[in-house]
Amino acid sequence: MNKGCGSGSDSCLSSMEEELHVLAVDDNLIDRKLVERILKISSCKVTTAENGLRALEYLGLGDPQQTDSLTNVMKVNLIITDYCMPGMTGFELLKKVKESSNLKEVPVVILSSENIPTRINKCLASGAQMFMQKPLKLSDVEKLKCHLLNCRS
């Protein structure tokens, strides 16, 4: 079913390039900039947030008075978040997104520098689309875009 996707096939990428808007969440500036750069190289529109609370604010879940939450939700096709962040972990962000009626369909990918099977399983069981090892690579983004394309078709 994934023919050509794992190899970076242009057909998989080209059909999503126009629409994929990613919210990238990481407390580490260097990691956040790396993710942003790789996503932009892959023709994604990128919005960044330095922590889970900022991400929730952007998505309209942080401030009850925020009125443009649906506008942002419609624009975000994917959330990529670091697992380990102060204040709110990527797992907690994942749970908030999946609890929201407006956001539960938005795929969430968790990034971590630690390969801990129980953590990975917990995230996947709670609705994460994928769990990826840091550092994020261009080939990871290509596979992810193809995976999302297959899920939508």
Curated annotation (Swiss-Prot):
Pfam families linked to this entry: Response_reg
Matches recorded under InterPro entries: ARR-like (IPR045279), CheY-like_superfamily (IPR011006), Sig_transdc_resp-reg_receiver (IPR001789)
PANTHER family to which the protein is assigned, alphabetical: TWO-COMPONENT RESPONSE REGULATOR, TWO-COMPONENT RESPONSE REGULATOR ARR17
Protein name: Two-component response regulator ARR17
Modification after translation: Two-component system major event consists of a His-to-Asp phosphorelay between a sensor histidine kinase (HK) and a response regulator (RR). In plants, the His-to-Asp phosphorelay involves an additional intermediate named Histidine-containing phosphotransfer protein (HPt). This multistep phosphorelay consists of a His-Asp-His-Asp sequential transfer of a phosphate group between first a His and an Asp of the HK protein, followed by the transfer to a conserved His of the HPt protein and finally the transfer to an Asp in the receiver domain of the RR protein.
Annotated GO biological process: cytokinin-activated signaling pathway; regulation of DNA-templated transcription
Compartment annotation: Nucleus
Superkingdom field: Eukaryota
SMART domains linked to this entry: REC
Organism: Arabidopsis thaliana
Listed transmembrane segments: none
